[in-house]
Design a protein with these regions (language model features):
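Rossmann-like NAD(P) dinucleotide-binding subdomain of oxidoreductase/dehydrogenase enzymes
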Residues: 106-195
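N-terminal Rossmann-like NAD(P)+-binding subdomain of aldehyde/semialdehyde dehydrogenases
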Residues: 1-116
Length: 195
């Protein structure tokens, strides 16, 4: 379909206040306790779901880039869509290698033993999106955080409402105990003050 920059994207954004942002943060903190993000197969299934959603919303990604940045469909497909799609497929294909224990030297004072570095999730990540390249600033850290086994709280840029709408449409189809978003104009300080 031919895109023009006079349309808008139909989506009702529900802006959060600081209480709902804290509630979403607490949902993610509670879901940390079940340790399901330590399961590599679960992480791969989340990345595959994200890839499926990314493909599903390709036209809206291109349309929002046209409306917000004035990018043509070709440029948007090459930069926003293709880069993020490649990032997801790269994470899926390499996750097995990334989670393997890494053998390392054992200190002499420990004696005869084998030592390994075992990759573990850190827990909860907070992602802020910039107004000028919202898709890359959201999805690249999101993909890496999910691959690492972390949960994500996302604060979209309020200066790019069309892009924010598409991102919210995609993230709302992801499991709510893995990804949450706090959309609002003055939630920056609330986001960085969370424990």
């Amino acid at each position: 379909t031919k895109l023009n920059n006079t349309d808008t994207i139909e989506c009702n954004i529900k802006y959060d206040n600081s209480e709902s942002c804290i509630r979403k943060y607490n949902i993610l903190r509670e879901s940390l306790k079940n340790h399901k993000m330590k399961n590599m197969e679960y992480r791969i299934s989340l990345l595959k779901k994200l890839l499926e959603l990314w493909d599903k919303y390709e036209n809206l990604v291109n349309k929002s880039n046209l409306l917000h940045l004035g990018q043509s469909e070709v440029i948007s497909s090459m930069y926003s869509y293709a880069i993020i799609r490649k990032e997801i497929t790269y994470a899926i294909s390499n996750l097995n290698k990334w989670v393997k224990p890494i053998k390392c030297d054992t200190p002499l004072f420990i004696g005869y033993a084998d030592s390994y570095v075992i990759p573990e999730p850190f827990g909860l990540t907070l992602i802020f999106s910039a107004w000028n390249c919202n898709f890359l600033n959201l999805f690249v850290p999101l993909i890496q955080a999910i691959a690492a086994g972390n949960l994500c709280l996302w604060k979209p840029a309020s200066m790019s409402p069309e892009t924010c709408k598409v991102c919210l449409m995609i993230l709302n189809e992801m499991p709510g105990d893995v990804v949450q978003s706090c959309a609002g104009k003055r939630l920056f300080l609330e986001g960085i003050s969370l424990p």
